[in-house]
UniProtKB/Swiss-Prot annotation:
It is a peripheral membrane protein. Its cofactor is Zn(2+). Belongs to the AspA/AstE family. Aspartoacylase subfamily. This is N-acyl-aromatic-L-amino acid amidohydrolase (carboxylate-forming). Plays an important role in deacetylating mercapturic acids in kidney proximal tubules. Also acts on N-acetyl-aromatic amino acids. Pfam families: AstE_AspA_cat, AstE_AspA_hybrid. PANTHER family: ASPARTOACYLASE (PTHR15162), N-ACYL-AROMATIC-L-AMINO ACID AMIDOHYDROLASE (CARBOXYLATE-FORMING) (PTHR15162:SF5). Keywords: Cell membrane, Cytoplasm, Host-virus interaction, Hydrolase, Membrane, Metal-binding, Zinc. It comes from the Eukaryota. InterPro entries: AspA/AstE_fam, Aspartoacylase, AstE_AspA_cat, Aste_AspA_hybrid_dom.
């Protein structure tokens, strides 16, 4: 496996971003809180910077104003010539790229943690680009070991040859927290508290790394996308059925060929006609209706994450 280089210096420039989607309220309110009371984000070797990523969408309690911000951090958006007619989120992505990046540069932030909620029953989902992200994989493993009761699942979103497009990709290292189920525009105390605890543990892990802790190699299980499935539709494009009760809320559970996936309004069931077992995620996600996605199909796979050696202390200045 070809892995990205492991950081060889302490991670000093760290950001926690909330409100990338303006109606995912755990991150919105945590970011707002930390902007006024940032002490919770301080550690001995660094202080994380809180960022409210999409202020306009947040003020309107909308996912986005003109364009999904978390799909906007590609070179085509970031490097194109600005115009007065640019969508709000394209302009905001460029601003965030200047603040936290520039993407793929030596000046970029060392780590960005991006906070999200989902209406799907994803539980505690850890989202990274790929298995090659060694620091992120060790962080995911640390969270799994710290909170076995949460069954933290790892979702690796980037397909082969695809450019990374989400907010945390502007940093040298990044991770997304995706917690649910929580309705859009609603703040649940349990989800809020869980996210707050996870953020603290992420920062604690970075502090461990900065202080010279070594992390051994390990085997990791994760999920990667292999396709998407739309709802059944009429000729006019309206829904003709919805997610079957036997599939609803079964994110990360195996879906076997022949199992029901949709219940038609006419009464019959539609069955999964694939040839192999898949693991659906983001099942019946509210934000994906407009994208024509009833659920994302993933495959489960196992891979080896190489060891992350301890940082070598910087030499003391000559006296």
């Amino acid at each position: 496996m070809c892995s990205l280089p492991v950081p060889r210096e302490p991670l000093r420039r760290v950001a926690v971003t909330g409100g990338t989607h303006g109606n995912e309220m755990s991150g919105v309110y945590l970011a707002r809180h930390w902007l006024h009371a940032p002490a919770e984000l301080q550690r001995a070797s660094f202080s994380a910077v809180p960022v409210l990523a999409n202020p306009a969408a947040t003020s309107g309690c909308r996912r986005y104003v003109d364009h999904d911000l978390n799909r906007t951090f590609t070179s085509s958006f970031l490097n194109s010539r600005p115009t007065p007619d640019d969508p709000y989120e394209v302009t905001r992505a460029r601003e965030l790229n200047q603040l936290l990046g520039p993407k793929a540069s030596g000046q970029a932030f060392d780590f960005v943690l991006d906070l999200h909620n989902t209406t799907a029953n994803m539980g505690t989902c850890l989202i990274a680009k790929s298995s090659h992200e060694v620091f992120a994989m060790h962080l995911c493993r640390h969270l799994q070991l710290q909170y076995p009761e949460l069954s933290c699942q790892v979702f690796l979103y980037q397909r082969s040859g695809e450019e990374s497009y989400n907010l945390d990709s502007v940093a040298k290292n990044g991770l997304g927290l995706e917690l649910g189920p929580q309705p859009q525009g609603v703040l649940r105390a349990d989800i809020f508290s869980r996210m707050r605890t996870l953020v603290a543990t992420v920062l604690d892990f970075i502090e461990l790394f900065n202080q010279g802790t070594a992390f051994p190699a390990f085997e990791m299980e994760a999920y990667r996308p292999v396709g998407v499935v739309d709802f059944p539709r009429t000729e006019a494009g309206h829904l003709a059925g919805t997610v079957h009760p036997q599939l609803q809320d079964r994110d990360f559970q195996p879906l076997q060929p022949g199992a029901p996936i949709f219940q038609m309004f006419s009464g019959e069931d539609l069955l999964y006609e694939g040839e192999s077992t898949v693991y659906p995620v983001f099942i019946n996600e509210a934000a994906y209706y407009e994208k024509g996605v009833a659920f994302v199909q993933t495959e489960k796979f196992t891979f080896t994450v190489p060891a992350m050696p301890a940082l070598t202390p910087a030499p003391s200045p000559a006296s």
